[in-house]
Regions:
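Membrane-interface helix/loop caps of multi-pass membrane proteins
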Residues: 1-379, 656-658
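Extracellular/periplasmic envelope-modification machinery, especially enzymes
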Residues: 258, 323-330, 340-341, 348, ...
Length: 685
């Protein structure tokens, strides 16, 4: 058995410590997420070391035996946490979150969680969703995909070398060349994807492979002990190199944040730092990183780092539902302690017995059988639960349709005094939190069928842009411009347009108002901020150049936006100068807390008007711009169909109004259609 690298255990302890502290207290360590990059470098080094030794010894790699070892090492603990998460989701989580949780548990069992999150993260709205109980499995998915891909690449590289008739040393050389080639491609992809699609770039495997490669290439670098230098010089360089690695990691952890374009170039800091520690860290020198990592507590944390990583996130997600409030210092410390205790128990009773089984169980076939059984159980349970929830939601949708057909007292129509509806805020059988949580316009509405509204303006010709309603001979063409608060109005606006001979042209990009300028942001701009500025300028240019657009309706969420009312006035004046009428949409009232409407209603015992609230009179740059005395802009206001007197409502006409804390549910938004259209016509008078 090879000697255990104590410095690697220390590096693992550092990595898991960074991640856990970041998840518990992100404001204290804004870049702690780089801990996962350290894990990737370690994995690349260790796995490549093992595979290259096997190549040196046998001339090839036994894929079955390699994968069996990975199964025994990783899956028992992972499956344990997934089973726990499944049971906890069904018992503890609100019904509105169960479907997302069980679906992602199934994806995690298949080690596809990173691709699920990448798909969801295309839209910042998806990031607004409550994080699932197994969201952290994205990193394990990347690792497992690497473990599948890496040995296959090595086998192919060896086969190619032999076909080319190289000498006996060529297998090792072929592996090194393959690593370099794949690493370069992956790094370039990472840089490009981080600049062009940063949300999904964070999760997908191709943007992360180069981090494994950096670790793997260390296997082919001559050991520092073999470098031709005097012992004192070697020790001095080793000490400096090790602490440089620590410094790079700590700088990234301290100064990176959610606005740092990542991975891309920025990931070089923690990746190179981890590589330096792996290369120079194996040292007994006093006060070297390697010697410090020999302390028993650090070694223990390194030993249980995998299990601690698995357990800490479900505990973080479950805490507020168990204790009724978000955790602060003491709650965070309790999660930390429980994670360590569970990590110790998991290693002793699950990981170690699985890694070192009895002889009759130490077979490749047994490992694969265990994997298949675990995957089938978890995906089967996940799939069955998802199907049950979907069936329940279809039943709710049918009841809602029946309610709509049964009369005028449905959805927003109950707020119309002409309908004289009784009990407008009553909780009925159609008020279902689980249904509302999934009642999202991007999954049910027009936006689920196309992507043209989300593409850069310069990449979409005017004829190909999202156009709806009467596209051939419209009486009026209205351009809808803005962020996700424009997008949740697309379907009700188009429904009205179809019966009034309007054409609707959509310019939308979630998170961007179309009114930002470079000066609105701190410099330098992040990739997302630069995208907003460019998209806004392109949108304005196209709208002004088009003679077929009559009205431009801007709809945005003011919360968290940096756009100024002064610049909005300037933009609107320029658009008006090109012959268009400009309208500003008053934002829908937002919930007073981060709790979603489905969650609040599920937790409420009120059968009438649950979770109603008095809205805050927050500043709104759109309304400020519309009220400019020198250049006023008409306002489209539908708040009378969301609020009565000084109270706003989460249940109206048998429907839950929001699917989260600020976006209208698809079904309720559709019920607003006639009133949205009427409000636009009133603003045009």
């Amino acid at each position: 058995m090879r000697e255990k690298r104590l410095d690697i255990q220390g590096l693992r302890a550092l990595a898991v410590g960074l991640v856990v502290i970041y998840h518990l207290w992100p404001g204290r360590l804004s870049g702690g997420y780089i801990g996962v990059d350290i894990f990737f470098v370690i994995s690349g080094f260790l796995i490549t070391s093992h595979l290259v030794r096997e190549v040196d010894r046998t001339g090839t790699v036994s894929l079955g035996k390699f994968w069996a070892r990975r199964i025994r090492r990783l899956l028992p603990a992972a499956f344990t946490v997934l089973v726990f998460s499944l049971v906890a989701a069904l018992i503890i989580l609100p019904k509105s979150l169960v479907r997302q949780a069980v679906f992602e548990i199934g994806a995690s069992a298949l080690y596809l969680q990173n691709w699920v999150l990448a798909g969801n993260s295309v839209d910042y709205l998806a990031a607004d969703n409550k994080p699932s109980i197994v969201q952290h499995f994205w990193t394990l998915s990347v690792e497992e995909q690497f473990y599948i891909f890496w040995p296959v690449l090595i086998v192919v590289a060896i086969w190619v070398a032999r076909k080319l008739g190289r000498n006996a040393s060529s297998p090792r050389r072929a592996v090194a060349i393959a690593l370099v080639a794949v690493g370069i491609i992956s790094f370039l992809w990472s840089v490009y994807a981080t600049a062009t699609d940063p949300s999904s770039a964070y999760f997908i495997t191709p943007t992360r492979v180069w981090e494994f490669v950096i670790g793997g290439l260390l296997v082919f670098v001559r050991s520092w002990d073999q470098v031709t230098l005097g012992e004192r010089s070697r020790d001095r360089v080793r000490l400096i190199g090790g602490w440089m690695g620590v410094a790079l990691i700590l700088v990234a952890a301290a100064f990176f944040n959610e606005d740092t374009p990542f991975p891309g170039y920025a990931a070089l800091l923690p990746v190179v730092g981890a590589a330096l520690l792996l290369y120079f860290g194996r040292s007994d020198l006093a006060w070297s990183p390697g010697s410090i990592s020999r302390f028993a507590p650090i070694q223990v944390l390194g030993d249980i780092s995998y299990a601690v990583y698995l357990w800490h996130w479900p505990l973080i997600v479950l805490y507020p539902y168990v204790f009724g409030s978000d955790f602060v210092v003491l709650g965070g410390l309790a999660i930390l302690v429980v994670s360590v205790v569970l990590g110790l128990l998991t290693k002793k009773f699950i990981e170690d017995p699985a890694r070192y089984p009895r002889e009759r169980l130490n077979r490749t076939s047994v490992a694969f059988a265990f994997m298949m059984a675990g995957v089938l159980v978890l995906t089967g349970a996940s799939g069955a639960t998802t199907l049950k929830i979907d069936a329940d939601q279809r039943a709710v949708a049918l009841r809602a349709a029946a309610l709509q057909e049964g009369g005028s007292c449905y959805g927003a129509a109950v707020m119309d005094e002409a309908n004289d509806c009784e009990d407008p805020f009553l909780v009925t059988s159609t008020v279902d939190p689980a249904f509302a949580a999934d009642d999202r316009y991007w999954e049910k509405g027009i936006r689920s069928q196309d992507t043209c509204s989300r593409q850069p303006v310069t990449e979409v010709s005017p004829d190909a842009r999202c156009q709806y309603g009467d596209v051939d001979s419209p009486a009026m063409t209205i351009a809808l411009v803005g962020d996700s608060h424009a997008e949740h109005l697309i379907d009700p606006l188009v429904t009205y347009a179809e019966t009034h001979n309007w054409r609707v042209v959509v310019f939308s990009l979630s998170g961007c108002t179309g009114l930002e300028t470079t000066d609105d942001f701190e410099q330098p701009l992040s990739s997302g901020q630069a995208e907003c500025v460019a998209w806004g300028a392109e949108t304005q240019a196209e709208i002004m150049a088009r003679n077929d657009i009559d009205v431009v309706l801007y709809s945005n969420r003011p919360s968290g936006k940096v756009a100024s009312s002064e610049h909005a006035v300037d933009v609107w004046d320029e658009v008006r100068a090109s012959g268009k009428t400009v309208l500003a949409m008053r934002n829908v009232p937002e919930l007073p807390s981060n709790e979603t409407a489905p969650e609040c209603i599920e937790a409420s015992d009120d059968s009438y008007d649950p979770c109603a609230w008095t809205p805050d009179d927050d500043s709104d740059f759109m309304l400020d711009a519309a009220g400019d005395s020198s250049s006023p802009t008409p306002v489209v206001d539908i708040s009378d169909y969301l609020c009565s007197e000084d109270r706003c409502h989460m249940v109206i006409g048998g429907l839950i109004v929001y699917f989260d804390d600020n976006h209208l549910s698809y079904t309720f938004a559709q019920s607003l259609s006639p009133y949205l259209g009427a409000a636009i016509e009133k603003a045009l008078e």
